[in-house]
Amino acid sequence: MNCFKILHRIKTGKEGFMVFYISLFLILWLAAGFAVGMKQVYVDQLFDKAVIERLEKEANDHGHADRMIKQRVLYIAAVTVSGFISVYYEMKTIPQRRNIRKIEKNIMKLNQAKKRRMKRK
């Protein structure tokens, strides 16, 4: 059998439907991962200078943080390949982010109250 007969058989038989569904699943998998990667990099600003400086201080290794963190394209590619796993992780961290935002708001209110007290004195 030559290649054209094999391709025609795949397109017309049950194998063709299976290939179609596998390719559809892979496209959805990669699209979900890519969307999460773009969100983390550009919306959540994962590569913000303050975040990078904090991670460098924690790691005490400036070169390692420079190689691993500052390359946005590699990060987006890794998250793209991870697909729905990254979507699950993002959905899992939503309640934690809400708690963090509440804590940040409380800290901001305390700082404002402290500034008001300092102005009165």
Curated annotation (Swiss-Prot):
Presence of the UniProt keyword Cell membrane in the record: yes
UniProt-annotated location(s): Cell membrane
TM ranges: 16-36, 74-94
GO cellular component terms, semicolon-separated: plasma membrane
Major place of residence: membrane
Entry keyword set: Cell membrane, Membrane, Transmembrane, Transmembrane helix
Membrane topology type: Multi-pass membrane protein
Record's protein name: Uncharacterized membrane protein YndK
Gene: yndK
